[in-house]
Amino acid sequence: MDAWLKYHAAYILPIVYLCYKTGCDLKKSTRQDRKLLLDAVRDAYHMLMELSVPVRPVGDEKSLEPGFANWIVKLIIYGMARTRIGALCTTEHCRHAPGEMEDLDSAFHELCFEKPNFPMPYFNQLYSEMPSWNQIRRIYGEKT
């Protein structure tokens, strides 16, 4: 369960960062934003693999490699950004649970401190493009 939760965080956090970057309106995200999101997920997965955390679900990392599974993931990300159900699953959750998102972010960054020199350029770029957690709390409040 521990490994699954870590990989879940690795997948969710780039979505969270993009949500906050776009003011919780993923319709504002560009194709380049969504590519950056998937590259950031890949960075986070590689970090966990570097920490010897077993991939859970088994084989999930293959969905980030070129091929049919990756095409499906891109389609899901596009749907998440362009549909009401996608907004409900992502932006509404970020809007109403900023404390939870910040806690998840803090916990993941604690893991990253174990390998401080491990390169995660896309993950760090997307993180740097969102408002600070202080700004997010001011905008959305502590609705956890």
Predicted segments with their positions:
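Short, surface-exposed recognition loops or helix-turn segments adjacent to catalytic cores
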Residues: 1-2, 125
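NAD(P)-dependent Rossmann-like dehydrogenase/reductase catalytic/cofactor-binding core
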Residues: 45, 49-144
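Active-site-proximal catalytic alpha-helix in oxidoreductases
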Residues: 2-27, 32-45
